[in-house]
A protein has these predicted regions:
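Small-residue (G/A/S/T)-rich helix-start motifs and N-terminal tracts that mark the onset
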Residues: 1-124, 131-151, 156, 160-285
Length: 285
């Protein structure tokens, strides 16, 4: 399998002197149901540190939508203010939609995923949204009919649900599982784990050589989602395909964690937010 070598793609993100925030794209992140607002906040902060021009959080927990400590740059909308999710996407007009961090699995979550799948722009799907795809065939059908391949970022458990198999089977042959996920969804897929794998229709599978056990902590995947969404948004005007943005996000995320561990920050106690900040340094270097 080909080694992931995507870091040089970051050179395409260099800002022109006359650049404005619109050039770096608008990211919409959907999730943050009650008790899970932190997942969406982590993804949002990661999007900021990864260079998104605008970052909008659509928070399903209305109470949490009014509290964003230490990150006033985030524009937070309560999902309850939008009775029609499809119209919300039209109104917000994002360049990229990322859905899943803290989304939940109830009917409200399903309605927002249906709207995201009907939207025709760049799409990143993670966490609870992947479980909804696995348990609702009509959502998987909608994903396959999306006008362009979405980027999916399952961990082994989510991958097992998508393929109706076991976590053990996924881990026993991760390369085969990646190929099966790509074929099953017709999407770009990041199979997370030790040395994450990246695959896509018509692309040679790639393996990330970076990463460490300190990344095995809740919220680390949310940071990857935010980073990927931000790079995908910038890529629209900086000539990065969604597959390229995905590869760059995976490697920058893992390298950021490795750099921190090399500095003595972890592996025990390494936090997702520390990785999000370090991603900024990786991209700019």
């Amino acid at each position: 399998m080909k080694a992931l070598a995507a870091l040089p793609l970051a050179r395409r993100l260099v800002r022109r002197h006359e650049a404005h925030k619109g050039d770096s794209g608008k990211v919409l992140l959907i999730g943050g149901a009650p008790t899970m607002a932190g997942a969406l906040l982590l993804a949002g902060r990661a999007a900021l540190y990864s260079g998104a021009g605008y970052t909008v959080l659509l928070m399903l927990d209305e109470a949490s939508a009014h509290v964003v400590p230490e990150q006033p740059e985030l524009m937070v909308h309560a999902a309850a203010r939008y009775p029609d999710p499809a119209q919300a996407l039209v109104s917000i007009a994002p360049d990229v939609v990322a859905i899943g961090p803290g989304l939940g699995l109830d009917e409200v979550a399903q309605r927002w995923l249906e709207a995201a799948l009907a939207w025709d722009g760049r799409l990143v799907i993670d966490a609870d949204a992947l479980t909804l795809l696995a348990t609702h065939p009509h959502l998987l059908d909608a994903l396959r009919q999306h006008p362009q391949p979405a980027a999916l970022t399952p961990h082994p458990g989510e991958a097992a649900r998508l393929l109706n198999t076991t976590n053990h089977a996924i881990q026993a042959d991760r390369a085969q599982a990646l190929q099966a996920l790509v074929a099953h969804t017709d999407c770009i897929v990041v199979l997370k784990g030790q040395h994450s794998l990246v695959g896509a229709p018509g692309q040679e599978p790639q393996v990330c050589g970076q990463g460490n056990p300190g990344m095995a902590v809740g919220g680390m995947g949310d940071v990857l989602t935010g980073c990927l969404a931000a790079l995908a948004a910038q890529g629209l005007r900086h000539h990065l395909t969604l597959f390229e943005a995905t590869c760059l996000a995976v490697q920058a995320h893992a390298l950021a964690a490795d750099r921190l561990v090399a500095q003595g920050v972890g592996p025990v106690g390494l936090t997702p937010m520390e990785v999000a900040v370090e991603i900024r340094r990786v991209i700019n270097s």
